[in-house]
Regions:
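Trimeric beta-solenoid/beta-helix "fiber body" segments of extracellular/virion adhesins
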Residues: 73, 78, 116-118, 125-126, ...
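Exposed beta-strand/loop interface patches that mediate assembly or binding
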Residues: 1-117
Length: 163
């Protein structure tokens, strides 16, 4: 039978394995952040931020300062842990409420969205778009294609075919 002291130690470890906090600072060189846990009046060490991939394909996402995050810690304490990610709350709500849409909304108002029900990709960019390819670029549409500019359209190539 487990004695009361060991039970209390185990309970303390489990209670401190998952914590909710606010990002206080970000270390760009290491892609780590420090988190403040107001419920315990504690501050973490620099914590790695969980991402989808880091080896051959790389995914980069970092939380903003003052963003609420969920952290998980190893049983050794808040010296060793990870930021799992951010979460929506009453202050910071989702950009859309539709299970058929995958949406990324940036601070400047730029939105990139895919609607799987409508089969439509939308990019509403509040700035320039730069597309580069080391190979060819094909744009095909089974419907009409429209190109509009409020100023000018420049096409530069050794050969231009219009049919």
């Amino acid at each position: 039978m487990i004695d009361e002291q060991r039970f209390l130690e185990l309970e303390s470890i489990v209670k401190n394995m998952v914590k909710v906090g606010i990002v206080e600072s970000f270390n760009q060189n290491n892609a780590t952040a420090r988190v403040v846990f107001e419920d315990a009046n504690l501050k973490s060490y620099d914590l790695p931020i969980m991402v989808k991939q880091t080896k051959d394909n790389k995914d980069y996402w970092v939380p903003d300062i003052d963003e609420p995050v969920i952290c998980i810690f190893l049983p050794t304490g808040i010296e060793s842990g990870f930021i799992l990610g951010a979460y929506y709350n009453q202050k910071d709500k989702p950009p859309v409420i539709d299970q058929n849409k995958r949406t990324v909304k940036f601070k400047d108002g730029t939105i990139i969205e895919y609607d799987r029900k409508q089969h439509k990709l939308t990019a509403d960019v509040k700035g320039d778009i730069d597309i580069k390819a080391t190979g060819k670029i094909d744009i095909n549409a089974s419907g009409a294609m429209n190109i509009h500019s409020d100023t000018s359209i420049n096409i530069t190539a050794p050969k231009i075919d219009l049919n």
